Amino acid sequence: MTLRDAVTKAVQQNPDVVLARLDEETARLNVRVAKDPFSPRVTVGSGLAYSNGFPMSVDGSPPSIVQARASSFIFNRQQSYTIAQAKEDARGAGMGVAGKREEVAYRTASLYVDAERALRAGELARKDADSLQKVLEAIHAQVLEGRALPLAEKQAALSVARAKQLAETLDADCMAAETALALAIGLTADDQVRPVAEARPVPPEAELGEGTISAALDRNTELRRLQSQIAAKGLEQRGAKAARLPRVDLVAQYSLLSTFNNYQAFYRQFQRNNGQIGMSFQVPVFAGTRVSADVAQAETEGAKLRVQLARARNQLSADLQASFREVKKAQTAAEVAGLDLEVAREQLSVDLAQMQEGRLPLRQVEEARIAENAKWIAFYDAQYALEKARWNVLRLTGNLVGTIETLP
């Protein structure tokens, strides 16, 4: 699986992303719940009863064969703020999904790079073991000829055993990395995802500047989510204050009365079908201490969120500056590792030429090959460290998912 395929699948089916989407859907449904009181609610029932004497009420209503009631909010400022708060919470939940996608994309890319590194390191370790095996065979021949001590053969055998042990360890690390990558993508623990050998383009390099940090702060989903929470708390505070405002409700009801409840005996006029529609006005006179407590609580929580927002902004700015420094350090290390590898490869070419001329034994050539493999591992480590550092910069600036999706 390529890096692009792995990240694309991860941002779709990773459990953390799925849970964030479910939270977003819950927040959207809460908006519908908050709007419900403004929709007419109609209930139909019956208060059927037999009356002996005066027709007394049944649950506050006269006895009736069929009874229907309808009610809804017409003006309720507190509930309107509750709806606005629910909408803001839904918007913040959407930002949480976007932030989780960036986080999962970076985690998946890091695991992919780790799995690819373990795979390549394992291949080089097996080559080292093969080279050391050839050295052991050469030393064994020298021991038989009396040109080397048996101790040298034992030391060579120990080197072979250590190389094989390292290869097995790297193979186990590769399997663990592939399993971790499968879990990040959203597969099961029984699955493994092996990276595809590909020539990926180097992640784009961003330049550090005031505009870069400012744009990253404006685009960061975590900061925007905190800003959304602060706005929601402001609406909650205004909604708590609105509890002191009057409210107007729509009320309507219909009753089908019976003739066996003695209405004719006690009322001059009687009709079976009865209905009424109107509005109910409520004006709070003494709201109690709860309103002021709710307002103070919302103010306190809003102040707490503002402190968290300031801390998150400072931390993000510091992380961005540190990430750019890490990119520069990794880039320098990659250049040094590349030069070191070139020297090792040139040395191996010289040793091979001397061996063909009979001026150098096979043992020294294989040792040079082992040294070259070690330089290859160091070179790969430096390249992967640079790649991960640049992915981290893209994550902090909010461009990671979009950049990876443009990969071939």
Task: Mark where each language-model region is.
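Bacterial Sec-pathway N-terminal export signals of envelope proteins
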Residues: 1-47, 72, 87, 147-149, ...
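A glycine-/polar-enriched beta->alpha junction
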Residues: 8-18, 25-40, 67-85, 95-102, ...
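Amphipathic alpha-helical coiled-coil segments
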Residues: 19-34, 100, 104-125, 134-141, ...
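Small/polar, glycine/serine/threonine/aspartate-rich low-complexity segments that form flexible
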Residues: 45-74, 82, 195-206, 238, ...
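Periplasmic alpha-helical coiled-coil/stalk elements that build and connect Gram-negative outer-membrane
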Residues: 103-215, 326, 330, 350, ...
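Metallo-beta-lactamase
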Residues: 170, 221, 305, 382
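Long amphipathic alpha-helical coiled-coil segments
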Residues: 180-188, 388-403
